[in-house]
Regions:
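Active-site catalytic pocket residues across diverse enzymes, especially alpha/beta-hydrolases
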Residues: 1-4, 53, 109, 133, ...
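Nucleotide phosphate-binding/pyrophosphate-handling subdomain across enzymes
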Residues: 1-87
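C-terminal helical cap/extension that packs against the catalytic core
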Residues: 2, 34-35, 78-138
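Active-site-proximal loop/hinge segments that shape catalytic or ion-binding/gating pockets
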Residues: 144
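Short, active-site-adjacent cap segments at secondary-structure transitions
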Residues: 147-149
Length: 169
Protein backbone atom coordinates (compact mmCIF):
# COMPACT_ATOMS: atom_id res chain seq x y z
CA UNK A 1 0.00 0.00 0.00
CA UNK A 2 2.91 2.33 0.69
CA UNK A 3 3.99 1.92 -2.95
CA UNK A 4 0.55 3.20 -3.94
CA UNK A 5 1.01 6.34 -1.86
CA UNK A 6 -0.72 5.31 1.36
CA UNK A 7 1.07 6.10 4.58
CA UNK A 8 0.52 3.40 7.19
CA UNK A 9 2.01 3.58 10.66
CA UNK A 10 3.79 0.52 12.01
CA UNK A 11 1.56 0.56 15.09
CA UNK A 12 -1.50 0.26 12.81
CA UNK A 13 0.06 -2.70 11.00
CA UNK A 14 0.89 -4.44 14.29
CA UNK A 15 -2.62 -3.78 15.64
CA UNK A 16 -4.18 -5.15 12.46
CA UNK A 17 -2.12 -8.33 12.61
CA UNK A 18 -2.85 -8.80 16.31
CA UNK A 19 -6.61 -8.42 15.80
CA UNK A 20 -6.92 -10.44 12.60
CA UNK A 21 -8.80 -13.72 12.82
CA UNK A 22 -8.42 -16.29 10.07
CA UNK A 23 -11.56 -18.42 10.04
CA UNK A 24 -10.79 -22.09 9.61
CA UNK A 25 -7.22 -21.78 10.88
CA UNK A 26 -7.03 -23.07 14.45
CA UNK A 27 -10.46 -21.55 14.99
CA UNK A 28 -11.76 -22.25 18.49
CA UNK A 29 -15.46 -23.10 18.59
CA UNK A 30 -15.73 -24.34 22.18
CA UNK A 31 -13.50 -24.17 25.25
CA UNK A 32 -14.34 -27.21 27.45
CA UNK A 33 -13.41 -29.42 25.78
CA UNK A 34 -11.40 -27.27 23.42
CA UNK A 35 -13.02 -27.79 19.99
CA UNK A 36 -10.97 -26.47 17.08
CA UNK A 37 -11.43 -26.49 13.32
CA UNK A 38 -8.56 -26.13 10.90
CA UNK A 39 -8.57 -26.18 7.12
CA UNK A 40 -5.42 -28.32 6.84
CA UNK A 41 -5.98 -30.46 3.74
CA UNK A 42 -2.56 -30.83 2.09
CA UNK A 43 1.04 -31.52 3.07
CA UNK A 44 2.03 -27.89 3.66
CA UNK A 45 -1.04 -27.10 5.77
CA UNK A 46 -0.67 -30.39 7.69
CA UNK A 47 2.95 -29.51 8.52
CA UNK A 48 1.82 -26.13 9.87
CA UNK A 49 -0.96 -27.82 11.83
CA UNK A 50 1.55 -30.30 13.31
CA UNK A 51 3.78 -27.39 14.37
CA UNK A 52 0.80 -25.71 16.03
CA UNK A 53 -0.19 -28.91 17.84
CA UNK A 54 3.36 -29.29 19.16
CA UNK A 55 3.46 -25.66 20.27
CA UNK A 56 0.01 -25.31 21.85
CA UNK A 57 -1.13 -28.79 22.84
CA UNK A 58 1.87 -30.68 24.20
CA UNK A 59 0.73 -33.17 26.86
CA UNK A 60 -2.94 -32.76 25.91
CA UNK A 61 -5.22 -35.65 24.98
CA UNK A 62 -6.32 -34.99 21.39
CA UNK A 63 -9.23 -36.43 19.43
CA UNK A 64 -9.35 -35.82 15.69
CA UNK A 65 -12.36 -35.56 13.44
CA UNK A 66 -10.75 -36.04 10.05
CA UNK A 67 -12.28 -35.94 6.58
CA UNK A 68 -10.37 -35.78 3.30
CA UNK A 69 -10.92 -35.48 -0.42
CA UNK A 70 -9.58 -38.34 -2.56
CA UNK A 71 -7.44 -36.06 -4.71
CA UNK A 72 -5.52 -34.52 -1.78
CA UNK A 73 -2.24 -35.68 -0.23
CA UNK A 74 -3.99 -38.11 2.13
CA UNK A 75 -0.91 -40.21 2.98
CA UNK A 76 1.21 -37.13 3.73
CA UNK A 77 -1.48 -35.48 5.86
CA UNK A 78 -1.86 -38.69 7.87
CA UNK A 79 1.92 -39.11 8.24
CA UNK A 80 2.38 -35.56 9.52
CA UNK A 81 -0.51 -35.52 11.99
CA UNK A 82 -1.34 -39.00 13.28
CA UNK A 83 1.27 -39.12 16.04
CA UNK A 84 -0.45 -36.34 18.01
CA UNK A 85 -3.86 -38.01 18.21
CA UNK A 86 -5.09 -40.32 20.92
CA UNK A 87 -8.22 -41.15 18.92
CA UNK A 88 -9.08 -40.47 15.27
CA UNK A 89 -12.66 -40.34 13.99
CA UNK A 90 -12.93 -40.33 10.21
CA UNK A 91 -15.84 -38.80 8.32
CA UNK A 92 -16.95 -38.51 4.71
CA UNK A 93 -17.10 -34.84 3.69
CA UNK A 94 -20.74 -34.42 2.58
CA UNK A 95 -21.98 -33.20 -0.78
CA UNK A 96 -18.65 -33.55 -2.55
CA UNK A 97 -18.06 -36.07 -5.36
CA UNK A 98 -14.32 -36.00 -4.57
CA UNK A 99 -14.90 -36.99 -0.93
CA UNK A 100 -12.94 -39.92 0.42
CA UNK A 101 -15.30 -42.29 2.23
CA UNK A 102 -14.82 -42.41 6.00
CA UNK A 103 -14.17 -46.17 5.90
CA UNK A 104 -11.48 -45.80 3.21
CA UNK A 105 -9.81 -43.03 5.19
CA UNK A 106 -10.00 -45.15 8.35
CA UNK A 107 -8.30 -48.00 6.49
CA UNK A 108 -5.42 -45.68 5.52
CA UNK A 109 -5.12 -44.23 9.02
CA UNK A 110 -5.20 -47.71 10.60
CA UNK A 111 -1.94 -48.56 8.79
CA UNK A 112 -0.14 -46.16 11.18
CA UNK A 113 -2.51 -45.48 14.09
CA UNK A 114 -4.27 -48.06 16.29
CA UNK A 115 -7.23 -45.96 17.50
CA UNK A 116 -9.32 -45.07 14.48
CA UNK A 117 -13.08 -45.23 13.99
CA UNK A 118 -15.04 -44.50 10.82
CA UNK A 119 -18.18 -42.52 11.63
CA UNK A 120 -21.28 -42.32 9.44
CA UNK A 121 -22.05 -38.60 9.74
CA UNK A 122 -20.61 -35.29 10.89
CA UNK A 123 -23.32 -35.11 13.55
CA UNK A 124 -22.29 -38.49 14.92
CA UNK A 125 -18.61 -37.48 14.86
CA UNK A 126 -19.29 -34.31 16.84
CA UNK A 127 -21.39 -36.20 19.40
CA UNK A 128 -18.93 -39.09 19.72
CA UNK A 129 -15.94 -36.75 20.05
CA UNK A 130 -17.69 -35.01 22.95
CA UNK A 131 -18.46 -38.34 24.61
CA UNK A 132 -14.81 -39.37 24.30
CA UNK A 133 -13.33 -36.05 25.41
CA UNK A 134 -12.76 -34.92 28.93
CA UNK A 135 -13.16 -31.29 29.96
CA UNK A 136 -9.46 -30.52 29.39
CA UNK A 137 -9.03 -32.47 26.16
CA UNK A 138 -8.78 -31.15 22.60
CA UNK A 139 -11.07 -32.05 19.70
CA UNK A 140 -9.48 -31.07 16.40
CA UNK A 141 -11.50 -31.18 13.20
CA UNK A 142 -9.51 -30.93 9.94
CA UNK A 143 -8.71 -32.44 6.54
CA UNK A 144 -10.99 -30.63 4.12
CA UNK A 145 -12.32 -27.11 3.88
CA UNK A 146 -15.42 -28.52 2.21
CA UNK A 147 -17.10 -29.64 5.44
CA UNK A 148 -15.87 -27.09 7.99
CA UNK A 149 -18.88 -24.84 7.35
CA UNK A 150 -21.16 -27.74 8.26
CA UNK A 151 -19.16 -28.31 11.45
CA UNK A 152 -19.49 -24.62 12.34
CA UNK A 153 -23.29 -24.91 11.99
CA UNK A 154 -23.41 -28.11 14.06
CA UNK A 155 -21.38 -26.53 16.84
CA UNK A 156 -23.58 -23.42 16.82
CA UNK A 157 -26.62 -25.68 17.09
CA UNK A 158 -25.01 -27.50 20.07
CA UNK A 159 -24.27 -24.18 21.73
CA UNK A 160 -27.84 -22.96 21.22
CA UNK A 161 -29.27 -26.23 22.56
CA UNK A 162 -26.96 -26.01 25.58
CA UNK A 163 -28.05 -22.44 26.29
CA UNK A 164 -31.72 -23.49 26.11
CA UNK A 165 -31.07 -26.30 28.61
CA UNK A 166 -29.34 -23.87 30.98
CA UNK A 167 -32.22 -21.38 30.70
CA UNK A 168 -34.76 -24.06 31.73
CA UNK A 169 -32.94 -24.74 35.02
Amino acid sequence: LEKCGYEIKETAIRKGLRETAWNGRLQILEEHPLFIVDGAHNEDAAAKLADSIEFYFTNKRIIYIMGMLKDKEVDRVIALTEKYADQILTVTPPDNPRAMHAYDLATEVAKVHPNVTAVDSLEEAVELSHLLAGRDDVILCFGSLSYLGRILKLMEKRKTAGNKRKAKR
